[in-house]
Amino acid sequence: MNTFLLDYHAILTPKKGFPALFKDYTSEGEARNRLISGCFHLDYLNESDYYRQLRQLESRPFDRELLATILRRQNTRYGCTELHLREIEKLRSPRCMTIVTGQQPGLFTGPLYTIYKALTAVVFAERQKTLFPEYDFVPLFWLEGEDHDYEESAHTAVFSAGGIMHFRPEPFRRMPDQMVAATCFGEDIRRIVADFLDQLQETGNKPLIASMLGDCCFPGNTLEMSFAQLMMHLFKNQPIVLLSSQDPDFKKLSRPVFLRELSTCPASSYNIIAQSSTLENLGYSAQSKPRAVNLFHINHHGQRQKIEYPEDNRFVITPDNIHLSRHQILELCQDHPERFSPNVALRPIVQDTLLPSFACIAGPGEISYLAQFRRNYEQFGLTMPFVIPRGSFTLVEPKFSRFMDKMLRISGKSGFSRKQIYHAFFSDLQTLKRNAERVGENPELDSLFFSIRDRIEKALKDLGPVLAKIDPTLEPMLAASTLQAMKTVDTIEQKARKAGRRKNEELIEQILKTETAFFPEGVPQERLINVFYYLNKYGMELIDTLKNLLAGHSTEAHLIVEL
C-alpha cells in the first residue's frame, strides 16, 4: 500500500484548497508563531506545554465519578465492549485525561472525515500514553446531537455508476429546529438502507454491512442513536468512548456554565468580537458570528429556540415570544438545565469545563472557529486544550493508481515521481487538463505528411520522362498512380489524427473520472463519501489500516493512500 504526503499549502484543488489559517497552523514559520501566540494557549510543537497542561488538569477538580457513570450508561446502550468500559473506568483517576473530538451524527456515520476524527483521537491518545506512561489518555467522541440541522446531518453519499448517489431519509413527524437527538427515522429508512446497499458491489463484506445497517437504522430509532451504534460496531477494537451531551445528567453537570453565560451575557459575545479582531489583524477571516446569548432554549418538542437579549436584564425566547427577566431565566436554568443547549461558541467551553480535555482533534474549519474563542476561555477561567489537526486522507482505488502510472508515462519527464503526479493533480488540476488536451495533438504530423506528399509527387514526376520514352501510354497510368498514392497518404493521415483524438478523449475522460473520485462534486472526497463504500470493497480491516497509517505519519500533511 503506497502512501504519499502532500503539504496543505500545495493543495489548491478544488477551488482554493484549505483555509489560510489552517495552512499556517499546520506549517512552521513566523505566521504560525503569531497565530499561536495571539489565538491559542498551547502549542502542540512545544514540549514544555505538555507538562504544563498535565499538571494543570491533574490539579483541577472534575466530577469524575458522575462523568464515568454517565459514560458507562450511555456506551452500554450503544453496544460497547469491555474494552470501552475499561477506558471509562480510567476516567475516575485524576491522572487520566481525555482526547476529545466530535461531530454531529451523520447518516450511516456520515462523511469519511468523521471516521478520520475518531481515528486521530485514538492514535493521539496512544502516542501520549507512550510519552507519559504514568498518565492515561482516553479518546472521547462528543455526539453533537443537539444540532438542529437535520438536512445536513441525515445525509450521506457514495459513488455509483452514474456518478454520486445521495441518501437522505424523511424524519418521523419532525418539528422545525428539532434537535437531531430528538428526531426519529420514519418508515422510509428501510427503503433508504435497501437503496444504499444496492449501490454497493456484491462482496464478502456486504452481508455484514447489511446486518449492521439493519440493526441500527430502523423506524423509531433516532439519528443520534443509530450513529452511535454504528460507531461502536466500527470501533469495537478501538478504545474510543462516546458522549451524548443531551443526557439530562450531563446537563446538570453543564448547569454552572449555562448559569454563568446567562448571568454575564453579553460578555462572551464581546470577548469573541475582540478575539476576532485580533484574528483579522493577523490576516484571517472570522468564521463565527457570536450572539448576545450563546445558548438555545429547548422546548418540550425538542426544538432549539434562540434566546434574544434586546435590553439589559430582559430575555426573549423566540419564536414563542416568551419574555423573561434575568432572575427568571436563571431560575429556569437552575431548575431545568436540560432545557438549555450551547451554541457553537459556548459548546467548547462546556466541553472543556466538564472534561479533563488534554487535547481536542479538530478539522480545518473547526480550528478556524477555535481561534476566535481564546478570550472566552479566559472569561470562564479555562486554558484551551491542545488543538490537533485531524488526519486527512484521499483514498485511491487501484484503477486510479494505474491511471497515475499512465500519467507518469505520458509526462515524458525522466525522474518524475508518482508523488509529483499527485502534486500536480491536487495543486493545479486545470493546467493538467489543458496539457492532456494537447496529448493527442502532434504538431509534427502537418510537416511530416506535407513532406511525404512532396517527396512522392517529386519522385513520380521524375519517373514521367523516363516512362514517356519507353511507352507514352504509361503516362496516364502514372497520373492515376500518383492520385492513388496521395489518397493512401490521406487515409493514413486521417487514421493517425483520429487515433490521436481518441487517445486524447480517453485521457481526458480518465482525468475527469479521477477528479470525481478525488473531489466528488467539487469537494474533497473525505467531506462527502461514506466509509461503507470503501469497507465493502476493501474489508472492515481498513479501519485498522488507516489507524496504523496515522500512527506513522504526522497530521500536518494530507495523506494519499493507494488501496
UniProtKB/Swiss-Prot annotation:
InterPro entries: Bacillithiol_biosynth_BshC, CC_BshC, Rossmann-like_BshC. Keywords: Ligase. GO terms for molecular function: ligase activity. Its EC number is 6.-.-.-. It comes from the Bacteria. Disulfide bonds: none annotated. The keyword Ligase applies. Belongs to the BshC family. This is Putative cysteine ligase BshC. It comes from Chlorobium limicola (strain DSM 245 / NBRC 103803 / 6330).
